[in-house]
């Protein structure tokens, strides 16, 4: 995070090269800057993938242009990466179908599309408007309760898959990639883990 590193100092931050050499999972959460000192467009290009040391899993939930599609395809084909999970794509909604077919999970740009995420975004927008107009508003934004708020599972991973199984969204997109915009626009409301109670499976 170069902008934060410039403001806060180097402590607690790592270079992209260090991450490329040491990480088994690399996940991108950066804004898209197309030029300048903080350029992130095609941050993951051929040179980046060639620098990887541990064949990591690549995850992108930021912006599609952060990863150069051709470079990722080559990295998958040559074993520079173990696998990829992609939620954001270059040239949406006309996404690269070869990449969609190769990735472990591919979803239609739905990061932040949970009911909680939409509620938080609405709350932030209202707060900004209130500050701008110097008014106080009394409001509550309460997402709908999940249909099954009580989760029984042996492990946390099993519990989380009951809350949300990304394979369903991935299968839907891989089956009908031409419906990218519809799958995104008609995305059903789902709650995040704070809305659930997890209990151990009875012995």
Task: Please give the residue ranges for each predicted region.
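Rossmann-like adenosine-cofactor binding region
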Residues: 4-97
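Short beta-strand "acidic-cap" motif of Rossmann-like dinucleotide-binding folds
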Residues: 1
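Rossmann-like dinucleotide-binding domain for NAD(H)/NADP(H)
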Residues: 55, 61-203
């Amino acid at each position: 995070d170069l902008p934060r590193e410039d403001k806060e100092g180097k402590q607690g931050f790592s270079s992209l090269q260090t991450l490329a050499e040491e990480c088994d999972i690399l996940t991108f959460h950066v804004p898209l800057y197309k030029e300048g000192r903080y350029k992130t467009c095609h941050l993951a290009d051929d040179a980046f993938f060639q620098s990887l040391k541990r064949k990591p899993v690549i995850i992108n939930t930021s912006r599609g242009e952060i990863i150069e599609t051709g470079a990722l395809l080559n990295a998958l084909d040559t074993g520079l990466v173990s696998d990829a999970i992609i939620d954001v794509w270059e040239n949406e909604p006309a996404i690269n179908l070869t990449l969609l077919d190769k990735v472990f999970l591919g979803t239609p740009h739905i990061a932040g599309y949970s009911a909680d995420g939409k509620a938080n975004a609405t709350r932030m927008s209202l707060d900004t408007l209130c500050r701008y107009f110097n008014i106080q508003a009394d409001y509550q934004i309460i997402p709908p309760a999940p249909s099954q708020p009580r989760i029984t599972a042996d492990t946390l991973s099993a519990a989380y898959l009951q809350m949300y199984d990304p394979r369903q969204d991935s299968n839907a997109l891989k089956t009908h990639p031409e419906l990218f915009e519809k799958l995104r626009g008609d995305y059903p409301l789902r709650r995040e883990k704070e809305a659930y109670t997890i209990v151990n499976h009875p012995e």
